[in-house]
Amino acid sequence: MMSFVSLLLVGILFHATQAEQLTKCEVFQKLKDLKDYGGVSLPEWVCTAFHTSGYDTQAIVQNNDSTEYGLFQINNKIWCKDDQNPHSRNICNISCDKFLDDDLTDDIVCAKKILDKVGINYWLAHKALCSEKLDQWLCEKL
């Protein structure tokens, strides 16, 4: 019984270290390379990430014919490739599961490509929720 409980705890702790629910200030810090990229302020990016994934780096959303991955909910039909959609255009030239870790480097590179190709309104939350009153998305701890 003791080994079962130990194994269960290890499984829970392992899972908890795999998923990363970031805080606003952590996102603000990790996205600093996006500051003013394409005319989009850092608070806009932080707000967009919150309303897109809730700052969950392992967020996966299944839609009718596609799946979206990670902090920025990057779509597998156009931007990345996975087993579900092997004929993706894969513009970011990356496996979608790379967007599910806490290293946001590849997420940021792909987000820049998305911004360059289709603009910030790729993320529907931006226009509706992240284009005004952005003071709440600043992080004073930095």
From Swiss-Prot:
Record keywords: Calcium, Disulfide bond, Glycoprotein, Lactose biosynthesis, Metal-binding, Milk protein, Secreted, Signal
Compartment list: Secreted
DNA repair among keywords: no
GO BP field: defense response to Gram-negative bacterium; defense response to Gram-positive bacterium; lactose biosynthetic process
Keyword Glycoprotein found: yes
Glycosylated residues, chain numbering: 64, 93
Primary localization class, coarse: secreted
MF (Gene Ontology): calcium ion binding; lactose synthase activity; lysozyme activity
GO CC, any one term: protein-containing complex
Tissues expressing the protein: Mammary gland specific. Secreted in milk.
One of the Pfam families matching this protein, by short name: Lys
PROSITE patterns registered for this protein in UniProt: GLYCOSYL_HYDROL_F22_1, GLYCOSYL_HYDROL_F22_2
SMART domains for the chain: LYZ1
Role played: Regulatory subunit of lactose synthase, changes the substrate specificity of galactosyltransferase in the mammary gland making glucose a good acceptor substrate for this enzyme. This enables LS to synthesize lactose, the major carbohydrate component of milk. In other tissues, galactosyltransferase transfers galactose onto the N-acetylglucosamine of the oligosaccharide chains in glycoproteins.
Family: Belongs to the glycosyl hydrolase 22 family.
Classification via PANTHER family: ALPHA-LACTALBUMIN (PTHR11407:SF32), LYSOZYME C (PTHR11407)
Assembly and binders: Lactose synthase (LS) is a heterodimer of a catalytic component, beta1,4-galactosyltransferase (beta4Gal-T1) and a regulatory component, alpha-lactalbumin (LA).
The protein's name: Alpha-lactalbumin
